[in-house]
Regions:
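Compact soluble domain cores
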Residues: 1-70
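Short, compact, well-ordered microdomains
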Residues: 61-104
């Protein structure tokens, strides 16, 4: 089952980094694909259960992916977050945002 993620958004700093660093861009897209396929990355078991409940109840879903060592020197954080907003009243998820934790 793939998650309906709505429109994909990035913070401006992630967009700039993805434009200038192909390896980061690939990592970011791989993280998004994992999130969409319900692989929440580097989160604790409790947060995985919360995400699993949110998939069926329409709540917000959050994943976290640790950057490979070769990318950390280019980034302000050691991971990125992928957040899909909760369903609206029509049952649609309107957007998913990729960001650094420090931008939250």
């Amino acid at each position: 089952m793939a998650l309906n993620t709505g429109e994909l958004l990035f913070t401006s700093s992630l967009a700039e980094l993805a434009q200038s660093n192909q390896a980061f861009s690939l990592f970011m897209m791989e993280a998004f694909t994992r999130h969409k396929n319900l692989d929440y990355g580097d989160i604790c078991d409790q947060d995985k259960r919360i995400n699993e409940d949110a998939v069926s109840s329409g709540g917000r879903i959050m994943s976290s992916y640790k950057l490979p060592d070769e990318l950390t020197e280019h980034c302000r954080d050691e991971k990125i977050w992928v957040i899909t907003e909760a369903e609206n009243q029509d049952g649609n998820r309107l957007c998913t945002t990729i960001l650094f934790p420090s931008e939250y």
